[in-house]
Amino acid sequence: MLILTRRVGETLMIGDEVTVTVLGVKGNQVRIGVNAPKEVSVHREEIYMRIQAEKGNGNVASGNY
């Protein structure tokens, strides 16, 4: 795992097309903004896991959360 330190307003790049920007820090919560092409799905981990579980049950999940 790569560990990076960023301050509010700073950005990191993932590949050539995905950016992650630290928008704010309040206590133990960090607000981030993700800018990615439409074909790249971006989900919180718990939502991603639910989508994967639904796929395993034959259900179709759509949309970003």
Swiss-Prot record:
A GO biological-process term: regulation of carbohydrate metabolic process
Disulfide-linked positions: none
One Gene Ontology term of the molecular function aspect: mRNA 5'-UTR binding
InterPro entries: CsrA, CsrA_sf
GO cellular component: a single term: cytosol
Protein purpose: A key translational regulator that binds mRNA to regulate translation initiation and/or mRNA stability. Mediates global changes in gene expression, shifting from rapid growth to stress survival by linking envelope stress, the stringent response and the catabolite repression systems. Usually binds in the 5'-UTR; binding at or near the Shine-Dalgarno sequence prevents ribosome-binding, repressing translation, binding elsewhere in the 5'-UTR can activate translation and/or stabilize the mRNA. Its function is antagonized by small RNA(s).
Subunit structure: Homodimer; the beta-strands of each monomer intercalate to form a hydrophobic core, while the alpha-helices form wings that extend away from the core.
Assigned protein family: Belongs to the CsrA/RsmA family.
Name of the protein in question: Translational regulator CsrA
Organism: Vibrio campbellii (strain ATCC BAA-1116)
